[in-house]
Amino acid sequence: MKPALLHPARALPSTGHIGRAATLALYDELSLTPKPGLVTLVDRGSHDDMDAHSFMRSLFALRSYFPKMAQAGSQGASFPVLERLGIEAEQRMLAATGGINTHRGAVFMLGLLCAAGGAVLAEQACIPGAAWLREALCRHWGEALQQRSLRASAPVSYTHLTLPTICSV
């Protein structure tokens, strides 16, 4: 059974739209306040090494990454290609922030969602909803993610947090 389409009457977004939405989501997260202990536009939270300015420098450095990930996903890029794009984006983020990790998790997870969104646009010609994104992520890069997760979690035995968990949600 195919997941339901979201807003089927709307014009389809482009990979650029997906990338801009990801960047805007990070800005919206920064703008959300109050967030005890976390950086906002008006507060450093519990961080003495980062503030809204470092987050904005990071966002500026990452703004071209998310559309690239969506484009790569739309072209069926392999996991190593996505990983390379992510590592390059992480390096730009760290250079822009003086080595401060403001968005490493977003580079990885939001980047993969952008790639999945690009894949759905290319394959289904629809606005991707959560179920479509999950299915594309599992189908295209699930095995590579599972192997990466197994390698990363082997010392602490989190093997239950792998592909079966992602794909069964």
Language-model segments: residues:
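Generic N-terminal targeting/processing segments that precede catalytic cores or assembly contacts
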Residues: 2-96
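A structural-propensity feature for long, helix-poor, extended segments
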Residues: 142-158
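Generic hydrophobic, helix-prone segments enriched in Leu/Val/Ile
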Residues: 19-24, 137, 155-158
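Single conserved hydrophobic/aromatic residue that forms the stacking wall/gate
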Residues: 160-169
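Gly/Ser-rich oxyanion-binding loop with an adjacent helix/lid
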Residues: 81-145
